[in-house]
C-alpha cells in the first residue's frame, strides 16, 4: 500500500524438498513424496487465493482511494480494492489484526450489486459467508481479528477438495540405473544441494549420472560458503539407519564420494571419498575417521563403492574388498553422491537391507 507494489513472487509455489534439507518448508504447499503422491495444502495457498480468485493481473487495477491501513503506525491491518477494467465489478481484500467495523460506500462506476464474502483465519481457510445486499450504495460489515476477507461482486470462487493419497516412506530397498531418463534430464528422486547432476551417456551407450558444474557458482547466502561443501546430491529417507548402499563410479578428475546417514544440505554424515590416484578418506561431518591409499588403483576404469551401516559399525568396500572399518556413532539420514568440480560419473545405485 505504501509503495504501491502490485506483484508478489512465491518461492517456490510447491515445495518438493527432502526433510531436513535447507528450505524444506518453503512454498505455498508441500509435495515432497512423488513416489506416493501425498501432498499438503498449507494455509498460504488460501491466503493467496484471497487475491488470485478475485482479480487477474491482466484486467484488474488497484483503486488508490480505496486502499488503506487500519493503523498506519503498525501496518498490521490493511485494505486493498481492485476494479475490473472491462466492467463495474470490484473486489476488496482485507487483513485484520483486531476486531473492526468497516463501512463501505460504493462510488459511481462500481457495481452496486450483491457482495459475496469469503473469509480465512488460522482455523478455517477460504470459507464463503453470507452475502451482503448494499442499501443506498452502502453497507457495514463486522470483521474478526487476525483474519483475511475478500468482498467481491464477482462469482466463480471455489475451494477445491480432493482425496489426498496416503503418505508413504521412500521405497526400500531401492535401485537406480538411470535408464528411465533422457540424456540431460534430472535423475528421479535425487535432490542436488550444490553443483548439478544430470543424466549422461556412458561409452557403452547406457545411461549414468554426471556432475556437470565446472566450478563453484556465487553463493548468495553465507551459510553455503563453507569450505567442506562441494557438489552433492541426496536420495532416500532421512530416517534410514541400518542399510548398505553401493554405486559404481568413474573418476574423471579430483575425487568422488559415496555417503550415508547424511542430513541437511552441508554434507553432515558419513562419507567415503576416493581420488583418481586411489587415496581415500572416511569422513564423518568434518572429522576424518580413517585414511589411506589403495595400492595399484586404476583411476581410468569404473569402480564400485559400498558402505555398510549397522548401529555404530561402519564398513567401506571398494570393488567388494573391505578398505576400512569404524566404530563411531549411530545416526540416520540419506544416501549421497558428491564430487569435486569435475565431470565425474555415478551409476547403479543400490540401497538394501543388511545381510
Region roles according to the model:
Residues 317-338:
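Short, solvent-exposed beta-strand-to-loop segments that form ligand-recognition rims
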Residues 178, 245-247, 301-310, 314-316:
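Short tryptophan-centered beta-strand motifs in secreted/extracellular beta-sheet-rich domains
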Amino acid at each position: 500500500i505504501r509503495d504501491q507494489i502490485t506483484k508478489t513472487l512465491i518461492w517456490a509455489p510447491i515445495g518438493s524438498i527432502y526433510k531436513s534439507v535447507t528450505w524444506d518448508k518453503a512454498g505455498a504447499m508441500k509435495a515432497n513424496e512423488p513416489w506416493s503422491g501425498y501432498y499438503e495444502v498449507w494455509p498460504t495457498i488460501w491466503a493467496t487465493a484471497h487475491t488470485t480468485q478475485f482479480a487477474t493481473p491482466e484486467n484488474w487495477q488497484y483503486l488508490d482511494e480505496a486502499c488503506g491501513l487500519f493503523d498506519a503506525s503498525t501496518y498490521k491491518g490493511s485494505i486493498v480494492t481492485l476494479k475490473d477494467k472491462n466492467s463495474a465489478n470490484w473486489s476488496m481484500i482485507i487483513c485484520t489484526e483486531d476486531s473492526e467495523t468497516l463501512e463501505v460506500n460504493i462510488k459511481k462506476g462500481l457495481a452496486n450489486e450483491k457482495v459475496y464474502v469469503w473469509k480465512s483465519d488460522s482455523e478455517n481457510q477460504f470459507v464463503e459467508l453470507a452475502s451482503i445486499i448494499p442499501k443506498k450504495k452502502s453497507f457495514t460489515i463486522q470483521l474478526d481479528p487476525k483474519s483475511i476477507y475478500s468482498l467481491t461482486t464477482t462469482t466463480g470462487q471455489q475451494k477445491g477438495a480432493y482425496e489426498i493419497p496416503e503418505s508413504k516412506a521412500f521405497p526400500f530397498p531401492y535401485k537406480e540405473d538411470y535408464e528411465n531418463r533422457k540424456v540431460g534430464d534430472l535423475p528421479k528422486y535425487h535432490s542436488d544441494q550444490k553443483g548439478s547432476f544430470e543424466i549422461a551417456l556412458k561409452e557403452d551407450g547406457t545411461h549414468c549420472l554426471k556432475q556437470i558444474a565446472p566450478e563453484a557458482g556465487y553463493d548468495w547466502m553465507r551459510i553455503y560458503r563453507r569450505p567442506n561443501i562441494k557438489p552433492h546430491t541426496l536420495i532416500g529417507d532421512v530416517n534410514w539407519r541400518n542399510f548398505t548402499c553401493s554405486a559404481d563410479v568413474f573418476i574423471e578428475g579430483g575425487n568422488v564420494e559415496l555417503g550415508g546417514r547424511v542430513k541437511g544440505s552441508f554434507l553432515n554424515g558419513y562419507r567415503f571419498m576416493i581420488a583418481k590416484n586411489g587415496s581415500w578418506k572416511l569422513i564423518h561431518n568434518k572429522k576424518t575417521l580413517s585414511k589411506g591409499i589403495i595400492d595399484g588403483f586404476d583411476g581410468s576404469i569404473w569402480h564400485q563403492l559400498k558402505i555398510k551401516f549397522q548401529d555404530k559399525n561402519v564398513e567401506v568396500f571398494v570393488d567388494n574388498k573391505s578398505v576400512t572399518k569404524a566404530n563411531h556413532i549411530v545416526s540416520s539420514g540419506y544416501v549421497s553422491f558428491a564430487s569435486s568440480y569435475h565431470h565425474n560419473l555415478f551409476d547403479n545405485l543400490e540401497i538394501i537391507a543388511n545381510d
